[in-house]
Every structure is written in C-alpha cells, then in structure tokens.
C-alpha cells in the first residue's frame, strides 16, 4: 500500500511537471509575442524599434498566460476523459470513403471553376518553362510538372487545358487522401459526430481548398505527409499498414521539398528500431531513397556544372543574423568583414535586411553564391565568431526572422506576404510584365472563371475574405495546439502517439532553422491539414481502454 501511495505521488509530480512545462512555454511565447507584435505589424519600419524582451510588463504577460495555459491543459485533459468519442457501431467504410471522395472533389471542382485553370506562382511557372531549370526547386517536382504539362500541351495545343488537367489530377489525389483519412478514423471507432467534424474542418477550411487548386510543391508535400501519418500510427502500434501508400507518400515527401529527407530519415530510423517485423521493408525503402537521391545529386552536378544553391538555401538564419549585426553596427573584426563583404557588399547587407524575410539578401544580384559555396567552412566560422560578440543581436534577429512560426498573436493581414499565402491567379507573386507573366502570355495561359460574371465576382469576393479570416489560425496557434495535445498524451503515457506526432515537430524544426520566411502561410500548410488528425487521435487515445 505504501508503495502504491509513493507511485501515485510520483505520478502526480510528473503530471504537474508536464502541465508546468506546457504552461511556461506558452507564457514565454506570449511574452515574446507581446514585445515583438508592434514590430511585426509595422514590419516596414521595424528597425526603429528598440525591443526589451524581459521587463515588468513582459513578465506580467508571461505570468498571466502561464496561469491561463495551466488552467487550459487541466480542463482539456479532464474534459477529454469525460467525453466519449468512440462508437461500438461499425461503419460502412466504403460509404465513408466514396461519399467523402465525391463531395470533396465536387467542392474543389467548383473552386477550380472559379479560378480556372488553377493557381500557382513563379516557382510553378519555372517548371513549365523548361526541363529542370534550376537547383532551387526539387528536381523530381520540376521534371514531373514539366513532363506532364508539355506532353498534354503537345497533344492538345492548349496550355489552359494542359494546366487544368494537372490540377484536376491533383484534386483527385487530394480527395483520395482525405477520403482515406476519414475511412481510417472510422475504422478506429471514432464517433460519427467527430467524424463529421473532421470532414467539415477539411472541406470548409478556405486555405485548404485554396492550396489544393494551386500547383505548389507545398501542396504535394502536405498531402503526402497527411497520407503518411495514419500509416506511421499503424506501424508504431503494430497494426496493419498500407505499404503502397507508405511508399508513395515517402517518395513524394522526400522529393517534393528540400526538407523532406530531414523529416523522413529520423522517422524511418525510429520505425526501424521499434517495428522489428517491418525492418526489412523499411531498410529497402530507405536504401532506395538514398540511392535515388544520390543519383539525382550526381545528375544535378552534371547538368549545372557543380553549381549548387542548397547551402545558401539552408543558411537563412545565419544570413539574417549577420545582416542584423551589420545594420545595428555590431562588433565585427576585419577578418570577419573580409568574408562577410565577399559574399555581399556592406551597403547591400544594410539595404536588404528585412523582418522575417531573407530573400532580398540571398537573391540580390550582388550576392556571390559561388564564393559562398566554395568557402562554407570560413562562412560558418565567421558566423560563429560573430555570435560570441553579438549574442543579443543574434537572438533578436532570430526572433524577428522566426516570429510567424511561434507568435500567439493573430496575423495582421497587412504584414503577411499574401502573394505566397493566398493564391488567386497563375502568377500570384509576380506581375504580368515579369518574365513569368510574359511567358504565360506567350502560351495564352491565363485565369478565366467558368462561372457567370456576376456569380464570379460575388463568390471570389467572399472566398478571398474567407481566406484572410483563415489566416487568423496562425502557425503559432496551431503549434500551441500540437504542444497541448503532446503534453496531454505524454501525461497519459501514450508514448506511441507521441512518436506519431514527431514528423510535425521535425517539419516545424526545419522551419525554425532554415525557412526563408515566417510570414508566408503556405510553409505551414502541413500543420493546417494535419491538425484534425492530432486533435482526433489525442482525444481518442487518452480515453481508449
């Protein structure tokens, strides 16, 4: 009996520590949000702000939000145990699948008709313009888009139809993945009302539909990621997984975005450790991916003569930290200046430093990527040596750059880069006089709604407003909900479910380390689409006996 009392006491202490960990993390994020939000709102004039992160008001905000977060996790954990989300009634799984597939395809079809033949951005148009044009985009994504588009264009001589067919194929793939997810949670015994809520969330969330009719690598990555999550859950829990889905999802995640491999390798290693019966399949799959990746890297070196932009793309945080040190007149030695200004002239560092956005620096015409690629070690040593003397500036620059990933404040829609957050046309982030706009004009590819003009004007106005409302569900809020669920799962000892959430944390970690911007919503599409999975499976598993 005494041992049981000790175990109960130890368990209560563990629970309180988990609750406090979540509470303090929310409090600290809230304090930083309170101090930095004025800067984010006025990002054009952010340099004139002198931010003091830790002061009396900031600590008060931290304390209040920590208390509120503690109450939140306590109430949610208790309420989740008292609400039954399981059902003993078997579902007609085929009915769930096909009804979802048909309804979702129909709704996306209406959206496509409204913005026919679909939307995109300059990265998309680059893929149409030539076969494997640059090293910025994943090679596989470029080659697939180019091959399908040019093949259909060659046969029908109509660029609009060719583009629309690719988007329609994307819609069908997305509808299959969503229908497969709802069939999967039905198989797990989720109550009908919660199943319907999942369906409503996915089908009614404006930006989910917006990205589904946009030809973006982020769309491919996110839907493949969403296809993979239920299968990871099944593998970790020793249940039957669908291996053809795993293979397809893993290949798309790996080759559709540069951080795909960084997400998959740790996950596959963990699955190899915990899923003994599947080790052979996992080993073959990982080896195949590595071999294909090596082959593509070799082909890239041959095609582009060794020119590679991958190192520059991974240096977003160091670049903004070094730029901030220049702008705020930090302590920089002559040797450090030599490396720094060989990459980019001093006046360009000062001119191009921006809040939460590194592209003006790395895409400046004076940026010497060849020097950077040839002097990686010297550049990293310079960055590290500057950090020792300018730590305060480095921390401030890091918080500025990653603000959109963790901030608890609702987006000021004027501060968001809408050209890469809400997609309304083919060349969404460029003008008609740009090289991308001119290319679209040369092949007569343009947006033209299939609906009547009056209806088009009405629906587009409403839909665009709805997309802006959707921006209020920020990456920071979604990450807070992920942390809330993870802590509740941890407290209830559902460690296998915690492992299932790991890919989401790896994606977020990549954004915090190497993302070029944090006020671009498309980078967080994976969180938006995966959120119902996280909430539903947390609710189900902590009450599952």
Residue ranges and their predicted role:
Residues 1-28, 50-108, 542-545:
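Start-transfer (signal-anchor) and selected internal transmembrane alpha helices
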Residues 52-55, 161, 165, 401-501:
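Membrane-interface anchor segments at the N-terminal boundary of transmembrane helices
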Residues 57-59, 143, 147, 155-176:
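Loop-to-helix entry region of an early transmembrane alpha helix in multi-pass inner-membrane enzymes
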Residues 115-128, 136-152, 157-161:
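Extracytoplasmic catalytic/substrate-binding loops of multi-pass membrane glycan-assembly enzymes
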Residues 122, 210-220:
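Short acidic/glycine- and proline-prone juxtamembrane loop motifs at membrane-interface regions
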Residues 165-188, 227:
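Transmembrane-helix motifs of polytopic, lipid-linked glycan transferases
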Residues 243-257, 269, 286-293:
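Membrane-interface alpha helices of multi-pass inner-membrane proteins
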Residues 305-446:
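Membrane-proximal stem/loop segments at transmembrane-domain junctions that anchor or position
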């Amino acid at each position: 009996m005494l041992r049981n009392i000790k175990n109960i006491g130890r368990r209560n202490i563990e629970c309180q520590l988990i609750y406090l960990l979540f509470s303090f993390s929310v409090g600290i994020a809230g304090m930083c949000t309170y101090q930095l939000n004025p800067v984010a709102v006025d990002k054009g004039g952010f340099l004139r702000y002198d931010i003091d992160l830790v002061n009396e008001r900031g600590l008060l905000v931290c304390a209040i939000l920590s208390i509120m977060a503690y109450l939140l996790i306590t109430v949610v954990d208790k309420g989740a145990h008292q609400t039954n989300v399981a059902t003993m009634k078997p579902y007609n799984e085929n009915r769930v699948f096909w009804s979802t597939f048909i309804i979702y395809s129909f709704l996306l079809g209406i959206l496509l008709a409204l913005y026919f033949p679909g939307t995109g951005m300059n990265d998309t148009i680059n893929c149409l313009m030539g076969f494997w044009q640059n090293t910025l985009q994943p090679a596989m994504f470029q080659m697939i888009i180019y091959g399908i588009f040019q093949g259909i264009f060659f046969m029908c001589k109509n660029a609009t139809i060719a583009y629309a067919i690719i988007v329609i194929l994307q819609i069908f793939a997305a509808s299959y993945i969503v229908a497969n997810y709802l069939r999967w949670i039905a198989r797990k015994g989720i109550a009908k009302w919660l199943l319907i809520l999942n369906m409503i969330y996915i089908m009614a969330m404006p930006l989910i539909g917006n990205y589904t009719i946009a030809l973006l690598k982020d769309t491919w990555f996110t839907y493949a990621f969403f296809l993979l999550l239920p299968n990871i859950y099944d593998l970790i829990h020793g249940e039957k997984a669908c291996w053809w889905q795993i293979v397809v999802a893993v290949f798309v995640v790996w080759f559709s975005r540069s951080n795909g491999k960084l997400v998959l390798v740790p996950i596959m290693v963990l699955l190899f450790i915990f899923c003994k019966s599947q080790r052979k399949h996992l080993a073959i799959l990982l080896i195949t991916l590595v071999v294909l990746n090596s082959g593509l890297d070799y082909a890239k070196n041959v095609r582009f003569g060794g020119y590679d932009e991958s190192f520059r793309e991974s240096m977003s945080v160091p670049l903004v930290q070094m730029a901030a040190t220049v702008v705020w007149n930090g302590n920089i030695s002559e040797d450090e200046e030599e490396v720094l200004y060989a990459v980019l002239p001093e006046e360009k560092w000062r001119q191009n430093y921006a809040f939460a956005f590194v592209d003006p620096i790395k895409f400046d015409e004076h940026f010497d990527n060849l020097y950077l690629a040839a002097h990686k070690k010297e550049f990293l040593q310079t960055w590290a040596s500057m950090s020792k003397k300018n730590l305060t500036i480095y921390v401030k620059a890091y918080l500025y750059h990653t603000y959109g990933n963790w901030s608890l404040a609702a987006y000021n829609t004027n501060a968001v880069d809408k050209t890469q957050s809400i997609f309304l046309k083919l060349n969404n982030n460029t003008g008609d006089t740009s090289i991308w706009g001119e290319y679209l004009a040369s092949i007569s590819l343009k947006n033209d709604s299939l609906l009547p003009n009056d209806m088009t004007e009405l629906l587009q106005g409403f839909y665009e407003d709805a997309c802006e409302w959707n921006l209020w569900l920020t990456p920071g809020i979604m990450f807070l909900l992920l942390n809330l669920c993870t802590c509740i799962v941890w407290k209830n000892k559902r460690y296998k479910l915690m492992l299932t959430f790991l890919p989401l944390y790896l994606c977020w970690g990549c954004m915090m380390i190497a993302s070029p911007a944090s006020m671009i919503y498309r980078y967080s599409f994976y969180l938006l689409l995966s959120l119902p999975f996280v909430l539903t499976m947390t609710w189900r598993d902590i009450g599952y006996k």
